[in-house]
Amino acid sequence: MNFLMRAIFSLLLLFTLSIPVISDCVAMAIESRFKYMMLLF
C-alpha cells in the first residue's frame, strides 16, 4: 500500500513537472504556425 501511494505521488509530481514543458511546446507550435500563416497572407 505504501509503495502504491509513493508511485502515485511520483507520477503526480512528474505530471506537474511536465505541464510547463508541454505548454511551452504547444505555444511554440502555435507561434510558428501563426508566423507561417502571416507569411502566406
UniProtKB/Swiss-Prot annotation:
Q: Which UniProt keywords apply?
A: Signal
Q: Which residues form the signal peptide?
A: 1-23
The organism's place on the tree of life at top rank:
Bacteria
Q: Does the keyword Signal apply?
A: yes
Q: What induces it?
A: In stationary phase (at protein level).
Question: This protein is called what?
Answer: Uncharacterized protein YqfG
Organism listed in the record: Escherichia coli (strain K12)
Q: What gene does the UniProt entry assign to this protein?
A: yqfG
